[in-house]
Amino acid sequence: DLKIVPNDPTIIYATTATLFYKSIDSGANFTQVGAGLPTSAGRMAIAVTAADSNIVYALSVTSGNIFQGIYKSTDQGETFTAVNTTQTQIASIQAYYDMAITASPTNANEIYTGFLNIWKSVNGGVTMTQVNNWSSPSSASYSHADIHFLRFYGNKLYCGSDGGIYVTTNGGTNFTDLTKSMQIGQPYKIAISKQNSNKIISGLQDNGGHVFNGIRWQNFYGADGMDVGIDPTNSNLSYGFIQYGQSLYKSTT
């Protein structure tokens, strides 16, 4: 990961999987810093904030993709203190694939992490609370699973995920899917109603199950959409499995 300090672009932080570096000359030279960070990390991500140019956060997981901790520096990355090493549920088992952290530009203690879900803290990472609901597409707090990108632009927090780009203006209470109108996807399976040839459902890689009513596609479950089917005697009943057949979902519309 690499981050530039918003209020002082001469300061740049960079990480490898296990090492933390700092430049104070716009990237011409880097020095290893980060005392207090884990020495056996598998991946690290960085967050900086315009609210305080001295503060930098590091999010760390083990080589086995287990949550290692959230670490905070108040001296521009020279030393770090572990602020949260116990909330292991924050990280998914695929942190090698999806992992992100960001901080509010107006409140240095407000941070967000992303793995499978988005988590929020208002006390500098000491306690984290899940804000989104990836498995309920109709929920106001829904955003797709697998978070790769979290970043503030003004008062808007943007989230880049396997299912598109989402934005919240109220700290994660509500998310808006900015890519909702882009009807694109990678189907695993497709089923067509025997009663109504305009009724189609599809299970999509990374994007759950979708129903087409002849006019538009509507998502009715999340995760990875796999096998799907429509009741042969009732076109309003649609079914879909997620990855590995773990759960079966049903739509009645």
Features from the language model and the residues they span:
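Beta-propeller blade termini and top-face loops
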Residues: D1-T253
